Amino acid sequence: ETLPHAMVTTNLAITHYLRGAFAPASRLLMDTITIGQTGSLMANTLSAIYLKAHLLRAQGALRMALKLCQDGLRLVEQRGWHDAPAAGFLYVALGDLLGELNDLSAAAEYLERGIDLGHEGGDPHIVIAGHVRLSWLRHRQGDVRGSHEAIRAALDLVERDAGSRFWPLPPADCYQARLWIAHGNLAAASRWAEVTHRARGDHPITYLHEAEDLTIARLLIAQGDPGAAETLLHGLLTAARSDGRYGSLIEMLTLQALAFAAQHRDDEALSALAEALELAEPEGFVRTFLDEGAPIAELLRSAVVHDRHASYALQLLKAFDESAATEQPLPEPLSDRELEVLRLVAAGYSNQAIANELFLAVSTVKKHINHVYAKLAVTSRTQAVARGRELGLV
């Protein structure tokens, strides 16, 4: 097969992939992987493995995706491609899968190696995907600075490389918004959601916008509007079931369980979680649950009590405990008033100027600043502003 033919096949697979037409995309990607194991087609082969692995994960076939990447590693070693820039695709895919399996240290090594190779080869797709995955992994580890630096690197590169918008990449802006939500910066996440809604307008539910919709569902739950989140998730669940995207379905059901729980609809919450556990257990999904934090842990305890996939729920609760023992704690979210004060501090306002701006007593401003210091674990204005920037608060 010629290189032009392989490139056309890969691009056609991407077109199907972005439309959510996984069956034809999968066939084309496997054709590329099968025929492309020669030096001239190396980049096509490794990028096809990356795409196929992501597709398999979305379908819920986590173990098959991992085997595909492990086979890819053997191919890379056999062909002497391990230092080739295109091998970065494979390493980023492995890092993503190992992260879901909660092997965070190995995941970080693969992601960092993939990013390095992407830089060496000047491939923005590898670098963007690697940084987005690394940002979320650093968040999982409680490394706020590392998470901020990684997502900032991804966003900067997306801004400079217009072509990246036409390649299947993890959406950097969605992950930035997820980080804001996790850190309690709902104002920034809300601004992102408003801009996203204006850019898209009214649209049918599609796989292309799935990450955005799931992020908005998380935001709605965090804002205390679980009913709106439930409505959004209902449409997403219908589409995912119809398309056989069981990996996506696990995440959606987990969020649906949280939305039900927030409305005190405990039986429905437990049923949604039980379905998610049923789909997840054979494949070993872990971080999809852990990433939702304490609320999902509470539901997992309920699953144990009611004997709904209790064995797997206990495994996940054990993983929660182990993560809590090793990860750095994230700071307590700032109140809206504390955020206002921090942003004025970052703008160079004195205590008196802040008091004038917000119609507060200077003593009240000092109290808010001390609360900010305590929550961010800092001791000065300079440190508070720096920490706030790391968290995307200012």
What residue spans do the PLM features occupy?
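Tandem amphipathic alpha-helical repeat scaffolds
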Residues: 4-21, 44-61, 86-102, 126-142, ...
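Amphipathic alpha-helical segments of tetratricopeptide repeats
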Residues: 1, 30-41, 70-80, 112-123, ...
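Helix-turn-helix DNA-binding segment
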Residues: 318-379, 383-394
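Intrinsically disordered or compositionally simple regulatory linkers and C-terminal tails
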Residues: 191, 298-337
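TPR/TPR-like (Sel1-like) alpha-helical repeat modules
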Residues: 267-285, 294, 307, 321
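Residue signature of alpha-solenoid helical repeat architecture, marking inter-repeat boundaries
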Residues: 3, 39, 43, 83-85, ...
